């Protein structure tokens, strides 16, 4: 399962603070880079999102909890919506329903 993990640094948090924590957690092995399928920072910094692959939500929590005192998180499970299959399904539903 994929999870969309939006993040925003708390006010007063610096790049150095985030950098130190990132390296600390990396060295402890808690970042699980094998689960991070994408990591994007928004223009201007201090915010962005990650796409994390995990079987269970608690596996995502294991990654983000060590950052919760300096970063706010908003996490949502994601489901892929294949475009062509979705169009065909919508056409079928509209034909049957109306």
Question: Which residues make up each language-model segment?
Answer:
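Conserved, structured core segments of small domains
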Residues: 1-98
